[in-house]
Amino acid sequence: GDDEIFEPWWGVGVAWDCDTPHTWGLAAPQVDSTNMGGFRYEHPIKTEADYERLAVPTFSYNPEKTERALSRMSDLLGDALPVRLTCQPPLAAMQAYYLEHLRGMEALVNDLAFRPELVHRAMAKLTEGILRATRAAEETGLLTANHHEPMSCSDPVNGQPADGRVRLHNLWTSVNSQEFQVISPAMQEEFLLSYQRPVLQQYGAVQYGCCEDLTQKIELIRRLPNLRVFVCSAWTDLDKVIERCGSSHTIMWRQAAAAVTLPDDLSAYQQHLNEGLRKLQGCHYQVVLRELETLKGHPDRLKEWARLGIELAERHA
């Protein structure tokens, strides 16, 4: 009953070699912390001096590894499903995610406030690495279109290439700023968006946002190059997003999973969804439910949710 898309083929991604033992030159080992699967990272940047150990990676296409992976999957699937090579850049404009992984959230926030020059140097290195990765992917000539995926389903971005060769401006990219949730708009512009922008301008279509509250940053995000989808999380003010975005961008209205999966029935949630879709009349929008951890004993809840969403969307079409 929903619109999850499954292609009639199995994709095998290109194999990349990286000239650093760890992507940014530093290992961030995972440390298990609970019997239920919880874990934490051992962040390798612990001092100011550690920032200088950040390395800018260079990626290269490995045809032998790629061919072996294709062959293995073809042998496994046989005639059941065709196998295709897929290729996307090995890094995206997720500088805040990469740096938090290396430094840790509390330390990163302190650095933004008291050691901003360190953050700027780190962001510059991360951006250089991302740009190298995107150029390397495009130069292989193997990039494959990604407009058929569930979160970025659209017509071909910037049309079908006349020569058949997909380039970055034919691709979607999806990025966010969750680690900057508590950072001011001005500091987000200075320390993140200014570094994301050179990467995003190479792509044909951009989706921005995830679970962060972007209410105070709507105008900043709207000015990003090639923005097509503004993600309005369950914590972002939908009214303000509609007011600023109107029909100029697609609004991806994400639902709070707990509101859908935990109650005994959907009656209270139905009021919320109905009111939101009423407000979204005249806009281009998507309603997305993700980040599910449990159905709390309601095995049919997702089917119920999909039916309800379709019914209310048709009512307010």
Please report, for each region that a protein language model flagged, where it lies by residue.
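Terminal, charged accessory segments of proteins
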Residues: 10-25
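A gly/proline- and charged-residue-enriched helix-loop-helix capping module
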Residues: 33-71
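Ser/Thr/Asn(+Pro)-rich, low-complexity disordered segments
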Residues: 1-10
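Conserved oxyanion/phosphate-binding beta-strand-loop segments in alpha/beta enzyme cores
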Residues: 23-33, 90-94
